[in-house]
């Protein structure tokens, strides 16, 4: 069933308590291929988000159709259409933002969150000299020039994606040639790269959005159980930015994860599996 005209491609593996895995940019649902086998005894659902992988890609208004709430609508519909009543939802990068949006809009569907940055609380620190050197790509993605230079050009796609996979990962991680080839294959068809950056054109998770976030009243904080896995070597999100989680989440726990970078599901999948199983042990429904 399509939501707003978008159908999501997804993998569904196993049976048991439900776990939904939401990927980041510049990835797709294969970001979780090392985590899924660690979740035996669970029903694991891994979609490609709107505009990614093998899911629908429409030249629609970005704000209306590619924002966090819009992406969350598709994930919520997928969960309910599969007959799942509640799930532990995992997300990193934009998948983290979408998981949080889902927990806010449909708390009945989300039993717990296992997420890594971004999370709210950064504020105007995002405009410091260091962050500005890292977040240039978000402004670039909003320019027509980005699609003119990259969209539909496999060599340009390969060089561009490789930069982020190398720069954002920890010192012990190297993306396999096979995985990079796969990502190039799904980001290279005409329109695919442009669809993937509609998230940024919607203003979702951008530096300006981070700077404008204000803490809610204590009673309005996100009440879903959550753990925030904060990597040691993520150049986008230094650990000192973890100091305001309690201002936005009422039941969140912070866990620093040493030795890894931005791509937690690929660099340290077992830490996610451990947290998922911990939540399920407390509340297996």
Sequence positions of predicted segments:
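Alpha/beta-hydrolase active-site loop signature
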Residues: 26, 50-53, 120, 261-264
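Conserved acidic functional residues
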Residues: 24, 93, 266-267
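Catalytic active-site module of serine/aspartate enzymes centered on a nucleophile-bearing elbow/loop
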Residues: 251-285
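Short amphipathic alpha-helix adjacent to the substrate-entry channel of hydrolases
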Residues: 30-44
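Active-site glycine-rich loops that stabilize anionic/oxyanionic intermediates
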Residues: 16, 24-27
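Flexible "cap/lid" subdomain of the alpha/beta-hydrolase fold that forms the substrate-access gate
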Residues: 6-8, 18, 30, 45, ...
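Structural cue for short, hydrophobic secondary-structure segments
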Residues: 21-24, 46
């Amino acid at each position: 069933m399509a939501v707003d005209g978008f159908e999501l491609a997804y993998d569904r593996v196993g049976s048991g308590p439900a776990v939904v895995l939401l990927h980041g940019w510049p990835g797709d649902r294969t970001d979780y291929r090392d985590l899924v086998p660690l979740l035996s005894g669970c029903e694991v659902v891994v979609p490609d988000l709107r505009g990614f992988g093998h899911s629908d890609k429409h030249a629609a208004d970005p704000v209306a159709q590619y924002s966090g709430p819009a992406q969350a609508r598709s994930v919520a519909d997928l969960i309910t259409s599969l007959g799942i009543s509640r799930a532990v939802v995992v997300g990193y990068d934009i998948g983290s933002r979408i998981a949080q949006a889902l927990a806010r809009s449909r708390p009945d569907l989300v039993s717990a969150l296992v997420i890594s940055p971004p999370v709210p609380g950064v504020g105007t620190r995002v405009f410091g000299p260091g962050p500005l050197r890292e977040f240039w790509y978000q402004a670039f993605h909003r320019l027509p020039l980005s699609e003119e230079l990259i969209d539909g050009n496999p060599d340009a796609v390969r060089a561009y994606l490789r930069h982020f996979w190398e720069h954002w990962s920890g010192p012990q991680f190297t993306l396999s040639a096979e995985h990079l080839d796969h990502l190039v294959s799904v980001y290279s068809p005409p329109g695919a790269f442009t669809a993937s950056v509609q998230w940024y054109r919607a203003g979702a998770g951008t530096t300006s959005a981070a700077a404008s976030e204000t803490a809610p009243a204590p009673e309005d904080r996100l009440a879903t159980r959550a753990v925030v896995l904060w990597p040691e070597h993520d150049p986008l999100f230094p650990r000192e930015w973890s100091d305001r989680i309690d201002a936005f989440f009422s039941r969140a726990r912070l866990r620093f994860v040493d030795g890894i970078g931005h791509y937690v599901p690929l660099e340290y999948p077992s830490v996610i599996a451990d947290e998922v199983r911990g939540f399920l042990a407390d509340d297996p429904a």
